[in-house]
Amino acid sequence: MNPDALSDLVLLLVCATVAWRDLRTRPAIAVGAGLIGLAALLGVLRFSGVAMVYGPHRFFSLLAACVAFTLLAAGLRWPDAAIARRAAAVGRCVVVVGGVGVALTVMGVGLWSQIVPGLSALVIVWTALQQRRAPAIVGALLLVGSFAVAATGKPGTLYLDYFNSTQALHYLLAAGIALLALPRLSAQADASAPPA
């Protein structure tokens, strides 16, 4: 397994864990992570030499850019809203926001797939700062770092003299999602406390 495939595998494992854990309680977080994980699964295959998944990998990466970060932002910012709690609302968001994003990108508005995750990242950073939770703040900063790598990374660029831009994107994204998806400890304590 080459280093690019390994970085996608790490991202896949993080996203699959988050999606599995949060599917019933936080579907927006779960589906957002799941879409990124699906793109990562196809990336593992692509970077392992399976040429026929190049197109599907690009499509699901685009879909994840257009809607997954929106779902993550909504799930973190408004955890009690319908978009964060109801699977049907999450499904509609994927179809509408993802469909519009893919259509706009195909029609030549390529910045759409960068603007939406960028705005979502700002919402996530703002939410993390308001919550004053260290893991969420670090996760949000790692997420912003992954977007910076995606926007500025060129082939041949090395980060920390070791990771190319693809690997840096995947590892930053994996670490950011893992930290952002950690449930609040007080919320866990409240849920596990015996009724009064």
Report residues per predicted region.
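Hydrophobic cores of alpha-helical transmembrane segments in multi-pass inner/ER membrane proteins
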Residues: S7-V18, L63-W78, L119-W126, H170-A187
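Aromatic-anchored segments of alpha-helical transmembrane domains
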Residues: L35-L45, V94-T105, L141-K154
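Membrane-proximal helix-loop-helix units in multi-pass membrane proteins
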Residues: R58-A128
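C-terminal transmembrane-bundle signature of multipass membrane proteins
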Residues: Q130-A196
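Membrane-interface helix caps and helix-loop-helix hairpins in membrane proteins
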Residues: G49-G55, V102-S113, G156-F163
